[in-house]
Amino acid sequence: MSVSLKLRIAGLAGLLMSPLAQAEFSIPGFELVHTVPVDTALGTDDLRQPGPVWSELFDGAKNSIDIGQFYAADHPGSVMDRVIERLEAAGKRGVKIRFLLEEKGIKLSQASTLERLRAIPNLTFRVLPYARVSGGIIHAKYMVVDGKQAFVGSQNFDWRSLEHIHETGLRITDPTVVSQVQAIFEQDWKAQQALADNQPVPLPAASSAPPRTGNYLVASPQRYNPPGVGDSQLELPRLLSEAKHEVRVQLLDYAPLSYGPDKTRPYYAVIDNAVRAAAARGVSIKLMVSNWNTDKLELPYLKSLAVLPNVQIKIVTLPEAKQGFIPYARVIHCKTM
């Protein structure tokens, strides 16, 4: 399996599979949440933004908050600043908080933000070197509150993700899916403890592929998925193979490339083959990517896809914020299909 797919929970694209999820913005058990970059005309008045949603989750927590994130970065006076205040308030009233961060995300994080998180009462902070588990990273962005509500999306625990990056996420109250997100957190939490104790990482019990009925979660890498959680590397191509009329995809970048040793980019065609096969049988493919998807390594693959019949590709550039240049921001970061 390519390293690029060894990511803990693959992001919103392919994460939640529901036979009911079509054009509606809300279905029972799920609320679509949208980060609208400030100083743009991309507003969606019928969707809430993640700052208020996360604050509401933390304010409503009674017993526990579990957070799995790639990295953490705050900024004074930002929406994230206020969100962390709500997390601090939860810890002060006795809510048990577990925060799990990817080891490779430490260098991307703000040191002051990590110090602030570690200082929260009743918060246990752990760092997981996921490369020692599967060779990849935790790229997940999720939280679970009281084992009854969850949030999963493209938003990093980063102030820019709440104000200056185009993002999507789901607030989840569906009991089955919440329990599956919780199970993934527990698996990774135990993995961190095992590595800290120089013990083998326990593998989840082997299980057959879950039935594709109702609402269900998929994640990767498959070998570390708890029972009942499907394999995103199988599900995404399968969804594309079942498409009859149209597929719309929005994401940061698109290229049939993985991440190998010594900064190599091995060819990885699983998803790309499925996209091309769908276009070949007449399915309309509409792909929207960010302007970060134009480097000399990735652009040729994008061009080779764009020349195919039934394929439309748009490269999107977001305007600079009125306050000036903000590094690692002003970009499409959604992962939706």
Identify what each model region corresponds to.
Residues 23-337:
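Charged, low-complexity intrinsically disordered terminal segments
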Residues 1-10:
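Bacterial N-terminal signal peptides that target proteins for export
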Residues 12-14:
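Hydrophobic helical h-region of N-terminal Sec-dependent signal peptides
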Residues 18-20:
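N-terminal signal peptide c-region/cleavage motif recognized by signal peptidases
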